[in-house]
Curated annotation (Swiss-Prot):
Listed name of the protein: Probable Fe(2+)-trafficking protein
UniProt record, GO biological process: cellular response to oxidative stress
A GO CC term assigned to this protein in UniProt: cytosol
Entries under HAMAP family matching the protein: Fe_traffic_YggX
Annotated organism of origin: Francisella tularensis subsp. tularensis (strain SCHU S4 / Schu 4)
Family the entry assigns: Belongs to the Fe(2+)-trafficking protein family.
TM helices/strands, residue ranges: none
Swiss-Prot/TrEMBL keywords: Iron
Single Gene Ontology MF annotation: iron ion binding
Origin: domain of life: Bacteria
Length: 87
């Protein structure tokens, strides 16, 4: 499997096997983010969608997730909603 130096985990890990999003952002993620980090983002995204009851049809919800994705993957910020608790 192809390796990538992951910006989130600061180490060489398995790359995402496909470009996860279209456009330049998708290319950047594919080139700089590991599959491990991408899977962690998908889990975190699910928490955000459920806890904030986001409607993904709404542009504001999509923009919010895009901003949170950038923070999570490239800035190392992983903020869970206040009301969230692990089971």
């Amino acid at each position: 499997m192809t390796k990538v130096f992951c910006k989130k985990y600061h180490q060489e890990l398995d790359a995402i096997p496909f470009q996860p999003l279209p456009g330049e952002l998708g290319k950047k993620i594919h080139n700089e983010i590991s599959n491990k980090a991408w899977q962690a983002w998908l889990a975190h995204q699910t928490i955000l969608i459920n806890e904030y009851r986001l409607n993904l049809i709404e542009p504001k919800a999509k923009e919010f997730l895009k901003e949170e994705m950038h923070k999570f993957l490239f800035e190392g910020k992983e903020e869970k909603p206040e009301q969230f608790s692990e089971i």
